[in-house]
C-alpha cells in the first residue's frame, strides 16, 4: 500500500514538473534536442543541413561561423558529449523561434573533460519551409 502511494506521488510530481508545449513549440524543442544529439555524435552532415549559411556560434572563448563550428565539431576541438537539459522555453517572433535552455554541458575541450552550467540561446529562422539554426550562444552561469 505504501509503495502504491509513493509511486502515485512521485508520478504526480513528475507530471506537475513537466512543461506542456504547443505543437509548434514541441517541434522546435525536438529539433533542439536532435541538434544536441548530432553534436554529441559529431554528425556534421546533419548539422550542416541544420545550420543556416550565415549562422554564428558564440562560445566562452570567441565567436565564429558555420564552417568553423562544423570543423571544430568534426575534429573534436570541442566534443559536446552530453547536454543535461534542466529547463527549456520557446518564444516566437517575426519568423524566428528562440529556444532558451538552462543546461549542464559535459564536453571535451582540447582533450580535457569539462562540465559547465550554461544558459543557451538558440535562434531558428524559417527558410524554404524548414527551420534552420541561425545563432547558438552559450552564457556560462555562476552556479558552479
Show which residues each predicted segment covers.
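Surface-exposed, charged secondary-structure patches
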Residues: 73-112
Amino acid at each position: 500500500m505504501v509503495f502504491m502511494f509513493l509511486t502515485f506521488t512521485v508520478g504526480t510530481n513528475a507530471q506537475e514538473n513537466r512543461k506542456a508545449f504547443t505543437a509548434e513549440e514541441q517541434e522546435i524543442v525536438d529539433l533542439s534536442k536532435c541538434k544536441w544529439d548530432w553534436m554529441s555524435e559529431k554528425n556534421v552532415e546533419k548539422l550542416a543541413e541544420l545550420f543556416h549559411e550565415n549562422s554564428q556560434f558564440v562560445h566562452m572563448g570567441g565567436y565564429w561561423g558555420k564552417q568553423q563550428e562544423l570543423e571544430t565539431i568534426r575534429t573534436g576541438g570541442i566534443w559536446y558529449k552530453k547536454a543535461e537539459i534542466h529547463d527549456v522555453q520557446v518564444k516566437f517572433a517575426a519568423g524566428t523561434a528562440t529556444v532558451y535552455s538552462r543546461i549542464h554541458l559535459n564536453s571535451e575541450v582540447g582533450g580535457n573533460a569539462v562540465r559547465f552550467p550554461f544558459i543557451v540561446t538558440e535562434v531558428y529562422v524559417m527558410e524554404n519551409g524548414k527551420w534552420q539554426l541561425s545563432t547558438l550562444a552559450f552564457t556560462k552561469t555562476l552556479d558552479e
